[in-house]
Amino acid sequence: MPIEIVCKIKFAEEDAKPKEKEAGDEQSLLGAAQGPAAPRDLATFASTSTLHGLGRACGPGPHGLRRTLWALALLTSLAAFLYQAASLARGYLTRPHLVAMDPAAPAPVAGFPAVTLCNINRFRHSALSDADIFHLANLTGLPPKDRDGHRAAGLRYPEPDMVDILNRTGHQLADMLKSCNFSGHHCSASNFSVVYTRYGKCYTFNADPQSSLPSRAGGMGSGLEIMLDIQQEEYLPIWRETNETSFEAGIRVQIHSQEEPPYIHQLGFGVSPGFQTFVSCQEQRLTYLPQPWGNCRAESELREPELQGYSAYSVSACRLRCEKEAVLQRCHCRMVHMPGNETICPPNIYIECADHTLDSLGGGSEGPCFCPTPCNLTRYGKEISMVKIPNRGSARYLARKYNRNETYIRENFLVLDVFFEALTSEAMEQQAAYGLSALLGDLGGQMGLFIGASILTLLEILDYIYEVSWDRLKRVWRRPKTPLRTSTGGISTLGLQELKEQSPCPSRGRAEGGGASSLLPNHHHPHGPPGSLFEDFAC
């Protein structure tokens, strides 16, 4: 007969709770043994930190007046450090700089600069033809020879060529130059190169950078000395004022390097007739700081293909290129002194469009033609002095020599003497007065003075913040699931062999057909099949 033994075990809810707690504690201890250690609390971190005063203010121990005073001292020191750090940062962000001057030792030979000169009068009156006067009427203010202001009927003037007009009607150096000497050697007009500027046809001495003339000594007599006749009788009469009308007499001079084009209408200085002008020069090599200390143009930016027509970048070349682009965009042509191969503007466009365009361009940092200074620049410092010429004796001599009267000599002749004061160059270099290394040094000193900290102390604090934050994130991500529990207990079904091994009471049932019945009540299974007998065992 098959026997099924069912043992119903019911636990009280009060008995189950301690067991669940014991199991939970065992699981927690097991997880703690297997998982990472819990992060240190603030008191433990403060007691081991290298930040001075933090352990006494926040470390383990009783709270009292002493700890409060330490906390106040720590906060005061921290506030003082932050104030000093902010002051240092503000000083660093102003990017202060200083200029260091270093006079170089005298050199046996120094390269002589380029000297550009222009007669202030642009057109010679005697060289102007009727067609020139007609085309240049708005530019010069001269009226056409026809009283009605128009050319004669049937007379056709050729189209004007501004380059030809300037080249033909400008003052010729061969006529102006009366004497020329360089370092004791004779020179002539062939040693000058023609260059066009806002003053028209001009001339540059020592213009070729590949064959620059050397100066072997300093002082007068070792540079360029020229005598010029400015030809005032060729100056245009003034009938009415225009933008090109000039009331001066003399020449404009600019001393510059060979790599820099002349920008003489703004950078030149005037030399008057009736005087001998002495220009003492000194070479100056300037080094400027790039961003963020200054606005100079670094070497890496100088080789851009935007300054076509010039071998090197310079402020003058940049300005001329910018002016050309503006005139070309508005007037669809360029002026004679501007680089390029575009069409030259006719005279009427000069006065109607080009001059107005140039006047509208700003030269400041906010204008469309802002040109930064190169970070490495060579310029020539000048000291100018003059004496009156000629004296009475030389006036009569020069009048006889050049077949002029003394009044003409006094009104037209001038002498220009350009020389090196000494064969030394002066180096001026901008240097950062407060750099990053100085800022870090000052911050480290203030940090050590007020809070006794260092870079490693900051790393300790960051490491502690990371440790605490990472532990909080892991707790959020790995929340344990709540186990399902029944409120009444549970029923466990055991097999016969398990029940016999675990039960303290012996079996009391008999097989089918036995004589004695079980001592347990309800020994007949109500759900058993007919003809079968089930016996219950209770423990």
UniProtKB/Swiss-Prot annotation:
GO terms for molecular function: sodium channel activity. A motif (GAS motif) lies at residues 452-454. Disulfide bonds join C118-C202, C180-C187, C296-C375, C318-C371, C322-C369, C331-C353, C333-C345. One of its GO terms (cellular component) is plasma membrane. Its main location: membrane. It is a multi-pass membrane protein. One of its GO terms (biological process) is behavioral fear response. Residues 1-68, 460-539 are cytoplasmic. Residues 90-438 are extracellular. It holds the Pfam family ASC. It is found in: Cell membrane. Glycans are attached at N191, N243, N341, N376. The chain crosses the membrane at residues 69-89, 439-459. Residues 500-531 are annotated as: Disordered. Keywords: Cell membrane, Disulfide bond, Glycoprotein, Ion channel, Ion transport, Membrane, Sodium, Sodium channel, Sodium transport, Transmembrane, Transmembrane helix, Transport. Belongs to the amiloride-sensitive sodium channel (TC 1.A.6) family. ASIC4 subfamily. Homotrimer. Heterotrimer; with other ASIC proteins producing functional channels. Does not exhibit measurable stand-alone pH-gated sodium channel activity but may form pH-gated heterotrimeric sodium channels. Its activity could also depend on alternative gating mechanisms. This is Acid-sensing ion channel 4. It comes from Mus musculus (Mouse). The gene is Asic4.
